[in-house]
Amino acid sequence: MLIIPAIDIKEGKCVRLTRGDFSQKKIYLDNPNDMAIIWRKQNAKMLHIVDLDAALTGEMVNFEKIREIVTNLDIPVQVGGGIRSADAVKRYLDIGVGRVVIGSAAVTNPKLVEELLHTYTSSQIVVGIDAENGIPKIKGWTESSMIQDYDLALQMKEMGIERIIYTDISRDGMMQGFGYESTRRFAERAGMKITASGGVTNAEDLHRLNELQPFGVDSVIIGKALYECNFPCQELWYNFEEEISLDHNFSTARKK
């Protein structure tokens, strides 16, 4: 089970939201690049970055912040948030982003996904489905779609998408555990590679999530629980906090 730390960027800062509510924003660091280096020092093998401003507006507001992170790291970075055009995808891939996450556009403009898969590989293009009660939400989770989450996944699968990032919005940022049943239901019906997201709070959640590997769930994105140091192994790192410098020497970690 690959654990992928999340970095959400709003107005240039590293933040976390609760259930995607922009009014419930907590700033963790002013510079997202510093946060990326800290996660790399803690042996992250991949990072998940979301441009929250772009998710609302469709404009690549934090592009330069993301470029800085990609330039400074030696691990794959996947990026999502407001990516609704082929040009946006190209710009991200051109700066070294390993994987681009298509969210709202998979609902509003599915032909874009089809076109992208003619140009790029299925490892570079994945679809993010952020669902509440089985209904995908779009445009920064401000609007509901008219399709079931698994139906959307099957449409994307038919086009050639191989991986879905599945978020149970009702659990995201709540620190109350992940949606085991909703994630299992979705994974069983989709029959695809699944990266789970939303609500993982502690090691027990990870053990339960591991039970879903037979259904294709092979990785998990974790945000607030990592920022709040909810895992015992993090205590070991922070006992040696002076050694977690913000340079680019990653000798303490190995690239997968």
UniProtKB/Swiss-Prot annotation:
It catalyses: 1-(5-phospho-beta-D-ribosyl)-5-[(5-phospho-beta-D-ribosylamino)methylideneamino]imidazole-4-carboxamide = 5-[(5-phospho-1-deoxy-D-ribulos-1-ylimino)methylamino]-1-(5-phospho-beta-D-ribosyl)imidazole-4-carboxamide. It is found in: Cytoplasm. InterPro entries: Aldolase_TIM, His_biosynth, HisA_bact_arch, Isoase_HisA-like, Isoase_HisA-like_bact, RibuloseP-bd_barrel. The active site is at 8 (proton acceptor), 130 (proton donor). SUPFAM superfamilies: Ribulose-phoshate binding barrel (SSF51366). Pathway: Amino-acid biosynthesis; L-histidine biosynthesis; L-histidine from 5-phospho-alpha-D-ribose 1-diphosphate: step 4/9. It is an enzyme of class 5 (isomerase). The keyword Isomerase applies. Keywords: Amino-acid biosynthesis, Cytoplasm, Histidine biosynthesis, Isomerase. One of its GO terms (biological process) is L-histidine biosynthetic process. GO terms for molecular function: 1-(5-phosphoribosyl)-5-[(5-phosphoribosylamino)methylideneamino]imidazole-4-carboxamide isomerase activity. One of its GO terms (cellular component) is cytoplasm. Its EC number is 5.3.1.16. The keyword Cytoplasm applies. Belongs to the HisA/HisF family. This is 1-(5-phosphoribosyl)-5-[(5-phosphoribosylamino)methylideneamino] imidazole-4-carboxamide isomerase. It comes from Pelodictyon phaeoclathratiforme (strain DSM 5477 / BU-1). The gene is hisA.
